């Protein structure tokens, strides 16, 4: 989706939960990736890239409190009308609110300083056993067949593609930051 919208600059704050996103961007030569360990510095660096290029920069971080370090740059982008795309990795629903360290509610975390914020739906073909066991997500149950799980995944993928398209269009058309929260195993 990012390439379809001609988004090429990606600033990655390394972490464990966002490894699939980092690998996805870094392994594609169409993206210009920057790895900056300190989240606050990474966010302001991304802000500068977008300010210079007048194009959205993708900003990627891991789950939990790391995301909050982006907040000052996001607020600056919001009030200065600078487009940023924040992609945060998150724990799946069944791993939230169980007392794990560095876990926060990432939904709408930038509420008053973000144009658009949504959480994508959880992939149901990865870690199916864990999803069934906890079933807090109510995505699939123990009686689901392989065929019904694949059908459900197609529906999830379609919904996520619509959310992404809406988010990216909002970012482009309004020159404001958007946030997509991505649940990952």
Per-region residue spans from a language model:
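N-terminal alpha/beta PP-like core and its mobile active-site loop of ThDP/TPP-dependent enzymes
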Residues: 1-185
